[in-house]
């Protein structure tokens, strides 16, 4: 029981590592929270610091979810891995190491799925990138993909999977509420794939 509680804390702390903040400060001498949207996530890093930093942060944020979800399997605990994944996402959104101002749950949630259901992860990746290249809205692509994740979980019939995806989708949409307003007002920035970045 003690091990279980400790691993939940570890999962949360893993999620709390603010890679966008670390990469910005160490690699560029910039506090990412003071630039762009102020969000500690991959999208703001891409827009503020360029492709190299953006990919680094996104991959690191994905791995947080993957590692946290794998904890019960690594330590042989008979507890559903998605609970640990949720703890990591909570840490990413409300990180103790960054005054509880974190990201929008997308990349770390993807990491949770990568560990728990690689097939669903692959399907959602196709959905996300298809939407992204069609609409060029990262936020809209993220929210729609989150809804598709819920549908995919329902198809599996896995009750805990369904609950977890509903919670994650709810978190993603909640964290993007400002983006929804900007999309409606047509002021939401679009991804510019032709723009030369660092």
Swiss-Prot record:
GO terms for cellular component: plasma membrane. Catalyzes the transfer of an acyl group from acyl-phosphate (acyl-PO(4)) to glycerol-3-phosphate (G3P) to form lysophosphatidic acid (LPA). This enzyme utilizes acyl-phosphate as fatty acyl donor, but not acyl-CoA or acyl-ACP. It is found in: Cell membrane. The chain crosses the membrane at residues 4-24, 71-91, 113-133, 147-167. It is a multi-pass membrane protein. Belongs to the PlsY family. Pathway: Lipid metabolism; phospholipid metabolism. Probably interacts with PlsX. It is an enzyme of class 2 (transferase). InterPro entries: G3P_acylTferase_PlsY. It comes from Bacillus anthracis. The lineage of its organism: Bacteria, Bacillati, Bacillota, Bacilli, Bacillales. This is Glycerol-3-phosphate acyltransferase 3. Its EC number is 2.3.1.275. Keywords: Cell membrane, Lipid biosynthesis, Lipid metabolism, Membrane, Phospholipid biosynthesis, Phospholipid metabolism, Transferase, Transmembrane, Transmembrane helix. It catalyses: an acyl phosphate + sn-glycerol 3-phosphate = a 1-acyl-sn-glycero-3-phosphate + phosphate. The keyword Transmembrane helix applies. GO terms for molecular function: acyl-phosphate glycerol-3-phosphate acyltransferase activity. GO terms for biological process: phospholipid biosynthetic process.
């Amino acid at each position: 029981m003690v091990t279980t509680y400790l691993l939940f804390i570890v999962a949360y702390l893993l999620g709390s590592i603010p890679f966008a903040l670390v990469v910005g400060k160490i690699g560029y001498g910039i506090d990412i929270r003071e630039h762009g949207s102020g969000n500690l996530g991959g999208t703001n890093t891409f827009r503020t610091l360029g492709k190299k930093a953006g990919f680094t942060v996104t991959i690191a944020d994905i791995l947080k979810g993957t590692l946290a979800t794998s904890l019960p399997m690594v330590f042989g605990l008979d507890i559903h891995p998605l609970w640990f994944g949720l703890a990591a996402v909570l840490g990413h959104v409300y990180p103790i190491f960054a005054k509880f101002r974190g990201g929008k749950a997308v990349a770390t949630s993807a990491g949770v799925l990568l560990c728990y259901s690689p097939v669903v992860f692959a399907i959602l990746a196709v959905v996300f990138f298809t939407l992204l290249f069609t609409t060029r809205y990262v936020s809209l692509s993220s929210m729609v993909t989150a809804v598709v994740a819920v549908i995919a979980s329902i198809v599996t019939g896995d009750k805990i999977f369904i609950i977890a995806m509903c919670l994650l989708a709810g978190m993603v949409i909640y964290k993007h509420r400002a983006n929804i307003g900007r999309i409606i007002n047509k002021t939401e920035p679009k991804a510019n794939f032709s723009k030369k970045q660092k």
